[in-house]
């Protein structure tokens, strides 16, 4: 097997890597597992070549022999090109097809008449095939299942979708081989276990590349740190420093963490350097497929000089011409940063160069922490989901839409997954009955009777239910989307209803890198025209924040310790030396904590009495901690608080002085009754109800409407709230309610990480200072609180006033 693949690679002037040879040999021996290697090192060919040269059987009774799963549609084209390159050069009798949400209807029909030998698809599109009648015949010659970018899927419910699909196909075709491809992940052995399932994981192969890719991280800094705002606006003030880098590079990807940042940066870049307009583009998941395709192909052809993007270009789409990567703001995790850095030097021996542009000066600490993390070579884990009853209910209806199922067969199949390996008989029976609306509070409503037993086979026997289910398959839940159509130019993309509903006809806003004016909003279609106005708003999407990983939190605390009074020697890190004036001011007014200390500051301003806590655990954990501590303080002495958080700490603002001393702090941060007090502090029922909306959508309780007739977001929300109250009051054993609280506690607030943080704080020395004015650590948190209730212009004025008053 290796000889054929090796000969083809040598013909192209490539040298096979050791991990590629190991993968070829493993497939030749009919083994399965995960290939783990860096971006651009040849992971795709490590699995693809063995199939093309040896595993493919030209005389098979069914053409479909290999399914290649990708988490993003953009990657499908690249995989198809990689396969087609070999097929054309070697004249192999193999057909490759793509089936995603973007595939045209005619192509889908052609595929159903004659399936390709290799089908490249997404988890959702694969599940749609399971909805087809007689779909069992499609898999009759299946030999190979490949899950690309497995690290992206594993920590999400899309990963659970894949677990169910893999277990089902294995049940139908026990001899099928399963392989995962992963670039960057910390818990590889667990990833292998989740991919292959408990029965096969022990014999799975973990093939890792020994290639160490050089990564150069370069911070973009102002001339003096005093010129950098302590709580800036997206780093735009450093644009003059970025422009020379863009002009010197042949091609650049500028990564932002969220789509709204992406739009603002494109707009700012065009205003600052209009000469770049013809060679600069924008790319994110809400822009239309046509625009994204054009950007990708133009970048690949070397026609674009710069692309501002989000994680939509994180993954392995092969853009070899990319020379430089820029990261705007902290990426919040080492693995994500490495993934993005790997987009440059996208070849096994290429060197990655990534510039770090901070949005405010303290964020430079993240750059120093990332450099340390890259040196240590440790990556974050992806925590897999377990007991996702919403996904299981959707899966039962999917099987019912297709060839039907027998419960005993499905139970055996799902127990072969990591997610459901410990599911109890009564839990499975509850899900089965819930999908049939048996014995539940929904029994009187026909639309919830989705499946029913017919001669021992459970089926969907209603075409309307089947059609609505096919339209709802998936686990990605977002706000209702509004199509944005340009007059005379077609679809630009989609914006969430919650943003567009705030606009009036004639208002300007920025989208897809251009200023447009809203002409009409009708039936969730926004008709727009080009506008010359530059004062339009930038859209905001829900879910627009990334949590700081626990590993990054630990590294940040280490770098801060280097600047503390307890550091044995002055830090030699150039970044720490550069922002030394800020640390000096922090030390002068308060204290710089080491890793064995917990800093608390108290001061008074015209807004009230501020108590600042600095665990350095990330914004998501701080939101939970702030609510927890506020609740526990309020139990002792009733008072109201305003809460603000960022990645470094949180603020409790009150109209009364809070008594603070070390014993009280340890009482507030105690671990006992953590879940009870947390849910009380955050109004757990209210937040669990919001979590329930997503769960109810996945489980098929909420239907978002037909094409052209979408159901508005507020109606979906009210329906979800009604169902939540009904289940809580009349269905005490409802597993979806239980799941809502579990996801709130274990996912949103990450109670396990919070418990670790509490343990660390309890063992730390409590340092309490009372500065006469806010400190550099406090200032960004204060600004975040003001940002919630002030316009951007008013906020800029207030920041300027505060900076003058508090730095004098």
Segments from the language model and where they lie:
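Short, well-ordered loop/turn sites that connect or cap secondary structure elements
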Residues: 476-478, 503, 510
